[in-house]
Amino acid sequence: MSKKKLNQPKKRIKRQILDGIAHIHASFNNTIVTITDRKGNTLGWATSGGSGFRGSRKSTPFAAQVAAEKCADRVKDYGIKNLEVMIKGPGPGRESTIRALNSSGFRITNIIDVTPIPHNGCRPSKKRRV
């Protein structure tokens, strides 16, 4: 019989990165925060749903703030000082996420809104009736 190899988790070498990009996707239901390096390689991410909020509480500014703080803690080891923020979507977590990243010790150099806006593209779905 052959011996089984034990799966040992590989230790990742944390490299020093000074500048990063924070991608914030703020939808009406959830907020996703991803911090990458300049090339686009993901360093860490967090969501308001993954931060313990469920249902309608996921879509609150406080849930987005908690997700941003959680993501900031995950990438602290890389030594990121400056962040460029790219925001996408109309959700309620837009401003609170930026405020949380700023208070986490990052210097925000640029804020870019990359919300996709159609130039009269596809026909929108029917009007919602509640």
UniProtKB/Swiss-Prot annotation:
One of its GO terms (biological process) is translation. GO terms for molecular function: rRNA binding; structural constituent of ribosome. The keyword Ribosomal protein applies. It comes from the Bacteria. GO terms for cellular component: ribonucleoprotein complex; ribosome. SUPFAM superfamilies: Translational machinery components (SSF53137). PROSITE patterns: RIBOSOMAL_S11. InterPro entries: Ribosomal_uS11 (IPR001971), Ribosomal_uS11_bac-type (IPR019981), Ribosomal_uS11_CS (IPR018102), Ribosomal_uS11_sf (IPR036967). Part of the 30S ribosomal subunit. Interacts with proteins S7 and S18. Binds to IF-3. Located on the platform of the 30S subunit, it bridges several disparate RNA helices of the 16S rRNA. Forms part of the Shine-Dalgarno cleft in the 70S ribosome. Belongs to the universal ribosomal protein uS11 family. This is Small ribosomal subunit protein uS11. The gene is rpsK.
